[in-house]
């Protein structure tokens, strides 16, 4: 028997709570936890890809260098810097007199 059939039953053409101890702090806490769980589940289904991408990659930017030897990291930095330096040649310096 599900919880909904026990708690929410039609009473005199209205929906009401059949349990008498609804003011019990344990029942209130369980209700709050249930509502929060439902909200989090809905958000998880809506934003599943964003959430998993965040936990997989975190806040890191750029390619991961984990497990890459330092010599390869330095070589990569030099390649990136040389690419930036090569692009500087495209700019024309204009001096106004």
UniProtKB/Swiss-Prot annotation:
Spans traversing the lipid bilayer: 23-43
Protein name: Matrix protein 2
Residues under site feature: Essential for channel activity, possibly by being protonated during channel activation, and by forming the channel gate and the selective filter: 37
Carbohydrate attachment residues: 20
Subunit and interaction comment: Homotetramer; composed of two disulfide-linked dimers held together by non-covalent interactions. May interact with matrix protein 1.
Domain notes: Cytoplasmic tail plays an important role in virion assembly and morphogenesis.
Record's compositionally biased regions (Basic and acidic residues): 71-80
Virion surface side: 1-22
Role this protein plays: Forms a proton-selective ion channel that is necessary for the efficient release of the viral genome during virus entry. After attaching to the cell surface, the virion enters the cell by endocytosis. Acidification of the endosome triggers M2 ion channel activity.
Other information: When the channel is activated, one or more imidazole moieties of His-37 probably become bi-protonated.
A GO CC term attached to the entry: host cell plasma membrane
S-palmitoyl cysteine lipid sites: 50
Residues annotated with Phosphoserine modification: 64, 82, 93
Any GO BP annotation: symbiont genome entry into host cell via pore formation in plasma membrane
Stored InterPro entries: Flu_M2
Regulation: The M2 protein from most influenza A strains is inhibited by amantadine and rimantadine, resulting in viral uncoating incapacity. Emergence of amantadine-resistant variants is usually rapid.
Bilayer topology: Single-pass type III membrane protein
Compartments, record wording: Virion membrane; Host apical cell membrane
Main localisation: virion
Chain residue ranges for the region called Disordered: 59-88
Record key words, sorted: Disulfide bond, Glycoprotein, Host cell membrane, Host membrane, Host-virus interaction, Hydrogen ion transport, Inhibition of host autophagy by virus, Ion channel, Ion transport, Lipoprotein, Membrane, Palmitate, Phosphoprotein, Signal-anchor, Transmembrane, Transmembrane helix, Transport, Viral ion channel, Virion
Intravirion side: 44-97
């Amino acid at each position: 028997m599900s919880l909904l059939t026990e708690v929410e039953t039609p009473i005199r053409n209205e929906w009401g709570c059949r349990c008498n101890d609804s003011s019990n702090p344990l029942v209130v806490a369980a209700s709050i936890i249930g509502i929060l769980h439902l909200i989090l589940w809905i958000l998880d289904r809506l934003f599943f890809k964003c959430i998993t991408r965040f936990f997989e990659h975190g806040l890191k930017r750029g390619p991961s260098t984990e497990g890459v030897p330092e010599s390869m990291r330095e070589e990569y930095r030099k390649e990136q810097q040389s690419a930036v330096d090569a692009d500087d040649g495209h700019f024309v310096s204009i001096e106004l007199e």
